[in-house]
Amino acid sequence: MLVELNLDAGNIISEDVHRIGILAVGSHLENHGPALPIDTDAKIASYVALEAALRTGARFLGVLYAASEFPYVKHGIHMDRDELVERELKPVLRKARRLLNLEAAVIVNGHGGNKLEDCMDDLEEELGLEIAWNNRIVEIEGPHAGSGELSAGLILGIADLRRLDECIPELYPEIGMIGLKEAREANREIDKAARICERDGVNPDPVLGQRILDDAVESVISDVKELLKIIQEF
Protein backbone atom coordinates (compact mmCIF):
# COMPACT_ATOMS: atom_id res chain seq x y z
CA MET A 1 0.00 0.00 0.00
CA LEU A 2 1.38 3.39 -1.01
CA VAL A 3 1.58 6.11 1.62
CA GLU A 4 0.06 9.44 0.62
CA LEU A 5 2.70 12.12 1.07
CA ASN A 6 1.88 15.55 2.49
CA LEU A 7 3.15 17.47 -0.52
CA ASP A 8 1.79 20.77 0.76
CA ALA A 9 3.63 20.53 4.11
CA GLY A 10 6.44 22.84 5.13
CA ASN A 11 7.68 26.21 3.97
CA ILE A 12 7.63 25.66 0.21
CA ILE A 13 6.68 27.88 -2.72
CA SER A 14 4.38 25.24 -4.24
CA GLU A 15 3.71 21.56 -3.74
CA ASP A 16 4.75 21.11 -7.36
CA VAL A 17 8.28 22.24 -6.43
CA HIS A 18 8.94 18.69 -5.23
CA ARG A 19 9.19 17.78 -8.92
CA ILE A 20 12.29 20.00 -9.30
CA GLY A 21 15.79 19.03 -8.19
CA ILE A 22 18.89 21.15 -7.67
CA LEU A 23 22.31 19.60 -8.32
CA ALA A 24 25.65 21.28 -7.58
CA VAL A 25 28.66 20.73 -9.84
CA GLY A 26 32.16 21.95 -9.09
CA SER A 27 35.73 20.77 -8.85
CA HIS A 28 36.85 18.85 -5.74
CA LEU A 29 40.49 18.43 -6.77
CA GLU A 30 41.85 21.81 -7.79
CA ASN A 31 44.42 24.17 -6.30
CA HIS A 32 43.16 27.54 -5.07
CA GLY A 33 46.25 29.00 -3.45
CA PRO A 34 47.09 28.62 0.26
CA ALA A 35 44.00 30.29 1.73
CA LEU A 36 41.27 28.21 0.07
CA PRO A 37 40.79 24.42 0.03
CA ILE A 38 41.10 22.28 -3.08
CA ASP A 39 37.33 21.66 -3.15
CA THR A 40 36.36 25.34 -3.00
CA ASP A 41 34.29 25.23 -6.20
CA ALA A 42 32.29 22.23 -5.01
CA LYS A 43 31.64 23.78 -1.59
CA ILE A 44 30.49 27.14 -2.95
CA ALA A 45 28.21 25.47 -5.51
CA SER A 46 26.83 23.12 -2.84
CA TYR A 47 26.04 26.02 -0.52
CA VAL A 48 24.23 27.92 -3.26
CA ALA A 49 22.29 24.84 -4.37
CA LEU A 50 21.28 23.85 -0.83
CA GLU A 51 20.29 27.39 0.14
CA ALA A 52 18.08 27.70 -2.94
CA ALA A 53 16.52 24.33 -2.12
CA LEU A 54 15.84 25.43 1.45
CA ARG A 55 14.19 28.65 0.32
CA THR A 56 11.99 27.08 -2.36
CA GLY A 57 11.35 23.51 -1.28
CA ALA A 58 13.01 22.03 -4.37
CA ARG A 59 14.87 18.74 -3.90
CA PHE A 60 18.56 19.08 -3.04
CA LEU A 61 20.38 16.45 -5.10
CA GLY A 62 23.84 16.91 -3.61
CA VAL A 63 27.02 17.52 -5.57
CA LEU A 64 28.65 15.77 -8.52
CA TYR A 65 31.99 14.21 -7.57
CA ALA A 66 33.98 15.11 -10.69
CA ALA A 67 34.65 18.05 -12.99
CA SER A 68 36.05 18.77 -16.44
CA GLU A 69 38.59 21.38 -17.51
CA PHE A 70 40.22 22.87 -20.58
CA PRO A 71 43.28 20.76 -21.47
CA TYR A 72 45.57 23.80 -21.23
CA VAL A 73 44.53 24.67 -17.65
CA LYS A 74 46.76 22.64 -15.35
CA HIS A 75 45.89 23.35 -11.74
CA GLY A 76 44.00 20.25 -10.67
CA ILE A 77 42.75 16.76 -11.44
CA HIS A 78 39.85 16.67 -13.89
CA MET A 79 38.22 14.38 -16.43
CA ASP A 80 37.21 14.65 -20.06
CA ARG A 81 34.00 16.58 -20.59
CA ASP A 82 32.19 13.83 -22.51
CA GLU A 83 33.23 11.27 -19.91
CA LEU A 84 31.93 13.55 -17.17
CA VAL A 85 28.55 13.84 -18.85
CA GLU A 86 28.17 10.15 -19.72
CA ARG A 87 29.63 8.50 -16.62
CA GLU A 88 28.78 10.99 -13.87
CA LEU A 89 26.11 13.55 -14.74
CA LYS A 90 23.64 11.41 -16.69
CA PRO A 91 23.49 8.57 -14.14
CA VAL A 92 22.90 10.98 -11.25
CA LEU A 93 20.09 12.81 -13.04
CA ARG A 94 18.56 9.58 -14.32
CA LYS A 95 18.50 8.07 -10.82
CA ALA A 96 17.09 11.27 -9.29
CA ARG A 97 14.35 11.37 -11.90
CA ARG A 98 13.38 7.76 -11.25
CA LEU A 99 13.55 7.74 -7.44
CA LEU A 100 12.18 11.22 -6.78
CA ASN A 101 9.75 11.48 -9.69
CA LEU A 102 11.43 14.63 -10.95
CA GLU A 103 10.37 16.55 -14.01
CA ALA A 104 12.99 19.31 -13.93
CA ALA A 105 16.41 20.17 -12.52
CA VAL A 106 18.68 23.15 -12.00
CA ILE A 107 22.39 22.41 -12.34
CA VAL A 108 24.39 24.90 -10.26
CA ASN A 109 27.91 25.22 -11.67
CA GLY A 110 30.74 26.54 -9.53
CA HIS A 111 33.68 25.67 -11.79
CA GLY A 112 34.69 27.57 -14.91
CA GLY A 113 36.08 24.47 -16.60
CA ASN A 114 32.68 22.78 -16.66
CA LYS A 115 31.64 23.93 -20.12
CA LEU A 116 28.49 21.83 -20.25
CA GLU A 117 25.85 24.33 -21.29
CA ASP A 118 25.70 23.08 -24.87
CA CYS A 119 24.96 19.56 -23.57
CA MET A 120 21.70 20.55 -21.89
CA ASP A 121 19.38 20.13 -24.89
CA ASP A 122 20.57 16.57 -25.48
CA LEU A 123 20.29 15.79 -21.76
CA GLU A 124 16.74 17.10 -21.65
CA GLU A 125 15.71 14.96 -24.61
CA GLU A 126 17.44 11.79 -23.40
CA LEU A 127 16.40 12.02 -19.75
CA GLY A 128 12.95 13.54 -20.15
CA LEU A 129 13.78 16.44 -17.85
CA GLU A 130 13.52 20.20 -18.16
CA ILE A 131 17.02 21.41 -17.24
CA ALA A 132 18.34 24.87 -16.35
CA TRP A 133 22.11 25.36 -16.45
CA ASN A 134 22.98 28.00 -13.85
CA ASN A 135 26.45 29.49 -14.27
CA ARG A 136 25.96 32.57 -12.11
CA ILE A 137 28.73 31.76 -9.62
CA VAL A 138 31.31 31.57 -12.40
CA GLU A 139 29.95 34.72 -14.04
CA ILE A 140 30.29 36.96 -10.98
CA GLU A 141 33.07 35.65 -8.73
CA GLY A 142 35.95 36.93 -10.86
CA PRO A 143 39.45 35.47 -11.31
CA HIS A 144 40.27 31.96 -10.10
CA ALA A 145 41.25 32.03 -6.40
CA GLY A 146 41.02 35.81 -6.55
CA SER A 147 39.26 38.36 -4.36
CA GLY A 148 35.72 37.25 -5.19
CA GLU A 149 36.24 33.55 -4.58
CA LEU A 150 38.27 34.22 -1.43
CA SER A 151 35.56 36.58 -0.16
CA ALA A 152 32.84 33.97 -0.72
CA GLY A 153 35.03 31.43 1.04
CA LEU A 154 35.41 33.84 3.93
CA ILE A 155 31.64 33.97 4.43
CA LEU A 156 31.38 30.17 4.26
CA GLY A 157 34.19 29.71 6.76
CA ILE A 158 36.50 27.82 4.40
CA ALA A 159 39.12 30.57 3.92
CA ASP A 160 42.26 30.74 6.07
CA LEU A 161 43.23 34.41 6.16
CA ARG A 162 46.32 33.61 8.23
CA ARG A 163 47.89 32.56 4.94
CA LEU A 164 46.84 35.64 2.99
CA ASP A 165 50.42 36.91 2.78
CA GLU A 166 51.32 33.74 0.89
CA CYS A 167 48.76 34.44 -1.84
CA ILE A 168 51.27 35.41 -4.49
CA PRO A 169 51.57 33.88 -7.97
CA GLU A 170 55.28 33.18 -7.57
CA LEU A 171 54.38 30.59 -4.93
CA TYR A 172 50.92 29.61 -6.20
CA PRO A 173 50.68 30.17 -9.98
CA GLU A 174 46.98 29.20 -10.02
CA ILE A 175 46.01 32.41 -8.19
CA GLY A 176 44.20 34.38 -10.87
CA MET A 177 45.88 31.85 -13.21
CA ILE A 178 48.63 34.48 -13.35
CA GLY A 179 51.37 31.88 -13.55
CA LEU A 180 49.59 29.48 -15.90
CA LYS A 181 51.32 30.62 -19.10
CA GLU A 182 49.81 28.01 -21.41
CA ALA A 183 46.28 28.81 -20.25
CA ARG A 184 46.78 32.56 -20.64
CA GLU A 185 48.15 32.16 -24.15
CA ALA A 186 45.32 29.85 -25.19
CA ASN A 187 42.36 31.71 -23.70
CA ARG A 188 41.81 35.45 -23.92
CA GLU A 189 39.30 35.49 -21.05
CA ILE A 190 41.71 33.69 -18.74
CA ASP A 191 44.43 36.19 -19.62
CA LYS A 192 42.05 39.09 -18.99
CA ALA A 193 41.14 37.72 -15.55
CA ALA A 194 44.82 37.17 -14.77
CA ARG A 195 45.60 40.78 -15.65
CA ILE A 196 42.86 41.96 -13.30
CA CYS A 197 44.32 39.86 -10.50
CA GLU A 198 47.83 41.13 -11.26
CA ARG A 199 46.58 44.70 -11.04
CA ASP A 200 44.30 44.43 -8.01
CA GLY A 201 45.83 41.62 -5.96
CA VAL A 202 43.82 39.33 -3.70
CA ASN A 203 41.71 41.21 -1.16
CA PRO A 204 39.10 39.39 0.94
CA ASP A 205 35.96 41.44 1.53
CA PRO A 206 33.02 40.00 3.51
CA VAL A 207 30.59 42.44 1.88
CA LEU A 208 31.67 41.27 -1.56
CA GLY A 209 31.54 37.63 -0.48
CA GLN A 210 28.00 37.92 0.85
CA ARG A 211 26.89 39.78 -2.27
CA ILE A 212 28.27 37.05 -4.53
CA LEU A 213 26.55 34.27 -2.58
CA ASP A 214 23.24 36.13 -2.31
CA ASP A 215 23.25 36.94 -6.02
CA ALA A 216 23.98 33.32 -6.94
CA VAL A 217 21.27 31.95 -4.64
CA GLU A 218 18.68 34.36 -6.03
CA SER A 219 19.63 33.35 -9.56
CA VAL A 220 19.01 29.68 -8.78
CA ILE A 221 15.71 30.51 -7.08
CA SER A 222 14.69 32.37 -10.24
CA ASP A 223 15.51 29.28 -12.31
CA VAL A 224 13.43 27.10 -9.98
CA LYS A 225 10.46 29.43 -10.38
CA GLU A 226 10.81 29.43 -14.18
CA LEU A 227 10.95 25.64 -14.26
CA LEU A 228 7.93 25.51 -11.97
CA LYS A 229 5.94 27.52 -14.50
CA ILE A 230 6.98 25.14 -17.26
CA ILE A 231 6.05 21.92 -15.48
CA GLN A 232 2.76 23.36 -14.24
CA GLU A 233 1.74 24.02 -17.84
CA PHE A 234 1.91 20.31 -18.69
From Swiss-Prot:
Reactions performed catalytically: 2-amino-5-formylamino-6-(5-phospho-D-ribosylamino)pyrimidin-4(3H)-one + H2O = 2,5-diamino-6-(1-D-ribosylamino)pyrimidin-4(3H)-one 5'-phosphate + formate + H(+)
Enzyme Commission number: 3.5.1.102
Source organism, top-level taxon: Archaea
Pathway: Cofactor biosynthesis; coenzyme F420 biosynthesis; Cofactor biosynthesis; riboflavin biosynthesis
Database matches in InterPro entries: Creatininase-like_sf, Creatininase/forma_Hydrolase, FAPy_deformylase
Cofactor(s) the record lists: Fe(2+); Zn(2+)
Residues annotated to bind Fe cation 2: H32, D41
EC category name: hydrolase
Binding-site list for Fe cation 1: E30, D41, H111
Cofactor: binding details: Requires one Fe(2+) ion for activity. Requires an additional second metal ion that could be Fe(2+) or Zn(2+).
GO molecular function, a single term: 2-amino-5-formylamino-6-(5-phosphoribosylamino)pyrimidin-4(3H)-one formate-lyase activity
One GO term of the biological process aspect: riboflavin biosynthetic process
Keywords annotated in UniProt: Hydrolase, Iron, Metal-binding, Zinc
Record's subunit section: Homodimer.
UniProt-listed HAMAP family: FAPy_deform
Family per similarity comment: Belongs to the creatininase superfamily. FAPy deformylase family.
Known function: Catalyzes the hydrolysis of the formamide of 2-amino-5-formylamino-6-ribosylamino-4(3H)-pyrimidinone 5'-monophosphate (FAPy) to form 2,5-diamino-6-ribosylamino-4(3H)-pyrimidinone 5'-phosphate (APy).
Name of this chain's protein: 2-amino-5-formylamino-6-ribosylaminopyrimidin-4(3H)-one 5'-monophosphate deformylase
Organism whose genome encodes this protein: Methanothermobacter thermautotrophicus (strain ATCC 29096 / DSM 1053 / JCM 10044 / NBRC 100330 / Delta H) (Methanobacterium thermoautotrophicum)
Gene name for this UniProt entry: arfB
